[in-house]
């Protein structure tokens, strides 16, 4: 789908998922670090045609998993991710690199895949907003079960002032209306954070005048990390 515009593309909100994660480093910083090392961010989108001229420039640094749809991203806090790392349930990219340099390539590969799967499992199809009309159901994540060849699911339900999420292990997690006050004294919300990501109808963003497509996402702080039973 293309949007023909006059002059430069009209972008609307220009804040990508990466922009929004970076805006809340005390809460989303560790998740952002994992995303940055994962290869899930891109500035050029490959359509997979085999023709480089078909590639599309991103309007910013985009999430490569997005595909003209709306998504929910559940972000565990810095402390929650650090706790997983202390318990040996999740590695860091620094540790993966250290293992690789030490010749522990099998461990480095396994830990790298575990990080990637962790991130994908926290990205859900369908944007769910606190305060919207109540909705519940089973929603696909971005993580494929290699045995069934189907996407892992999350059971998510919108409540009056929260979202309840049941993961593959049966554990229930919650998105609350969490807020904090930043260094300037401004109250910031850690739920219903909106992002939109654009693709130009050209591989060169500096000369593009058309938009090819866009995707949107809503980001929430979640009270504990999701698990698919790995």
Language model regions located:
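Mature, structured domains of secreted/extracytosolic soluble proteins
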Residues: 1-230
């Amino acid at each position: 789908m293309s949007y023909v515009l006059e002059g430069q593309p009209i972008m609307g909100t220009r804040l990508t998922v990466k922009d929004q994660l970076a805006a809340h480093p005390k809460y989303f910083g560790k998740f952002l670090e994992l995303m940055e090392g994962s290869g899930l961010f891109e500035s050029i989108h490959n359509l997979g045609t085999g023709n480089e001229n078909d590639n599309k420039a991103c309007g910013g640094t985009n999430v490569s998993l997005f595909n003209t749809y709306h998504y929910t991203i559940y972000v565990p806090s810095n402390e929650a991710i650090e706790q997983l790392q202390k318990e040996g349930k999740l590695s860091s990219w620094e540790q993966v690199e250290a293992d690789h340099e030490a010749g522990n390539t099998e461990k480095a590969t396994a830990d790298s895949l575990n990080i990637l799967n962790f991130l994908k499992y926290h990205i859900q199809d369908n944007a769910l907003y606190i305060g919207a009309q109540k909705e519940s159901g089973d929603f696909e994540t971005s993580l494929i079960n290699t045995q069934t060849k189907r996407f892992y699911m999350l059971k998510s339900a919108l409540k009056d002032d929260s979202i309840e999420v049941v993961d593959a292990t049966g554990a229930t997690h919650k998105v609350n209306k969490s807020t904090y006050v930043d260094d300037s004294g401004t109250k910031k919300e850690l739920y219903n954070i909106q992002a939109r990501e654009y693709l130009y109808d050209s591989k060169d963003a500096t000369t593009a005048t058309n938009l090819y497509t866009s995707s949107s996402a809503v980001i929430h702080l979640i009270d504990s990390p999701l698990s698919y039973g790995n």
